[in-house]
């Protein structure tokens, strides 16, 4: 059985199907991924449309999307609904609100950055998929534990930075545009890219183990979260580079 330390893609959920259930497929998982990205696009378009007439409301939507998406993500992970499609769709729309506002703000400061970050994200996805396909990096249990631990460390760093900001403080170099700040962004992108290997591996294992079809949503959910992370880190890196 394929083992995973990823809290979104728990290994026992992908262990196999019971008699009579539809089973997980690659095409089904791709369809779920496309569905979630359509929800993200819808949320982003709503924020962009609102920003044209009411910038203040667009900023509110961005905040609601960011906070609400984070809470919804935690609810989904810890409640483990048997049919998670609706909740994951809501999560994706909330993330769309946030990403739409985030992209507008960054685009106003750095024209063209959205396209650059989008292309960068696609390139990272493509490269990591090829690395996975040719088994240059294999998602072994030790690899997955290491990458998931690194991801958790990044999350704690950002969470600490968020709380410190209320006291007018911050983590040194995290948001700086100097060499150290750029290196930090590169490391974070590297960790996010390695998480794609984990996502690919768990999805493939779910298909091979004939996991229930509902697991397609979980595979799509994990991959979507990782791609959102890659995009945000790519925007941060490009903004730092363009500040120099």
Role assignments for model-derived ranges:
Residues 1-244:
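A hydrophobic alpha-helical transmembrane-helix feature that marks the membrane cores
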């Amino acid at each position: 059985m394929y083992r995973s330390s990823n809290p979104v893609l728990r290994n026992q959920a992908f262990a196999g199907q019971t008699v009579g259930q539809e089973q997980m497929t690659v095409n089904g998982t791709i369809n779920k991924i496309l569905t979630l990205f359509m929800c993200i696009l819808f949320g982003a378009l709503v924020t962009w449309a609102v920003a044209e007439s009411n910038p203040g409301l667009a900023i509110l939507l961005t905040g609601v999307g960011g906070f609400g998406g984070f809470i919804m993500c935690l609810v989904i992970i810890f409640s483990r609904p048997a049919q998670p499609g609706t909740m994951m769709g809501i999560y994706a729309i909330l993330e769309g609100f946030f990403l739409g506002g985030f992209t507008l703000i960054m685009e106003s400061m750095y024209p063209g950055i959205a396209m650059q970050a989008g292309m960068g994200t696609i390139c990272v996805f493509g490269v990591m998929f090829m690395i996975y396909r040719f088994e240059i990096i294999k998602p072994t249990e030790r690899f997955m534990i290491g990458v998931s631990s690194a991801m958790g460390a990044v999350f704690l760093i950002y969470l600490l930075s968020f709380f410190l900001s209320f006291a007018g403080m911050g983590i040194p170099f995290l948001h700086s545009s100097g060499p150290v700040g750029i290196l930090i962004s590169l490391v974070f992108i590297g960790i996010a890219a390695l998480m794609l290997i984990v996502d690919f591996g768990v999805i493939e294992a779910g298909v091979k183990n004939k996991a229930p079809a509902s697991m397609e949503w979980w595979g799509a959910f994990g991959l979507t979260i990782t791609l959102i992370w890659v995009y945000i880190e790519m925007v941060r890196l490009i903004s730092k580079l363009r500040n120099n």
